[in-house]
Amino acid sequence: ARGTTEAICANALISAVLGTRLPGPGTQYVSQNLRLLGAVRPGDRLTVQMQVSSKDTATHHVTLDCTCTSQEGVAIFQGQVEVVAPTERIERTRTALPEIHPDAQGRTGLQHLLAHVAHLQPIRVAVAHPCDVPSLSAALEARHAGLIEPVLVGPRGRLEAVATEAGLDLADVAIVDVPHSHAAAQQAVALAAAGEVEALMKGSLHTDELMSALVSAAAGLRTKRRVSHCFLLQTPAYPRPFIVTDAAINIAPNLEQKADIIRNAIELAQVIGVREPKVAILAAVETVSPTMAATLDAAALCKMADRGQITGGLLDGPLAFDNAVSIAAARIKGIVSEVAGQADILVVPDLESGNMLAKQLIFMGGAASAGIVLGAKVPVILTSRADSRDTRIASCAIALMLAHHYRLSPP
């Protein structure tokens, strides 16, 4: 709607300037008063100017005049913001996440992601039972993109029939002939355990079938962590890619399982370029309530981070979804947090809420996505039968990054 886009742009741009430039990292919002003056169109280049109009040295409150103009000099918004400036210089490493969403010039986020991993050599991937056109096509397209060297594990006759149906060439593709999907899952896992492949990819078999083979004690792929799934998402309305976890593997995780879910997500975020990811532990409310287990778990997980039991990220929770992704919503509710409004990772209470959240973002919110399983000795490319080609290829690119990371830091 008219005005909504401009309001979102205003909040995002002002927050970016305040948090990175003037006053810089550590700045806390107090209030803002902005007037929307013009419209924003796709492809516009906006310039924000901020100037200190007053400051109180006793309270460190600073008032800044703000103006935003388009490339044509048209005023988009103007007004004032009041903040509490940091009392000492804070430096944080600038990070650049691989984009996975189309930009205004028509370049797809997948193209950005492929460029981001172009310097990495492809990895051998066991593709378990790719006996339908989408899964077989995705494996071969990922090969063509230079991401993987697929080893197809399934009934040779069915694989060749699917290839013929889709006009795909299997002449130079390795095939391990097994009789059925259950054997395909076991053989794919065995290839990974033997070091013959560096990742697994789900084909047309059921997720439970592959995961059961993966986590079997006899398989040899388990680590000290519990396996969990991460959706890497990017929506038009949020300024950075983010992770939703766990929406596919752990149905009703307990406290220790949630800790592993967070550890896995932090590792993924760091691999894709976020040095210290901000982790929002979601619940329906942002206060701790004895009658809501999700809020108790969130509080305990934050204390675990305080005690060094979870490292590598900044944790806060419980946070309602709006407080986790909207600085304005967090400010209205009086939440002072380094995570609120700018989360890199959203930790959901259970699989049902996470799955619904992720799929709402994908199918109704226009989110681009990738899906990966962590916590085993090799990454697992785990996508849904309804996922797009771009989602499958993006998931392979994420697995490529993880596999190269595991060469240096085995899980």
Language model features by range: what are they?
Residues 1-27, 31, 90-95:
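Hot-dog-fold acyl-thioester-processing enzymes
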Residues 30, 35-36, 42:
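Short, conserved secondary-structure segments in the cores of folded domains
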Residues 30-31, 65, 279-282:
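Beta-strand segments within the central parallel beta-sheet cores of soluble alpha/beta enzyme folds
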Residues 38, 52, 68-70, 80-85, ...:
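Short, structured patches in soluble enzyme cores that scaffold and shape functional sites
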Residues 42-103:
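HotDog/MaoC-like acyl-thioester-processing domains
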Residues 103-151, 155-339, 344-411:
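Anion-binding alpha/beta catalytic cores of soluble intermediary-metabolism enzymes, centered on
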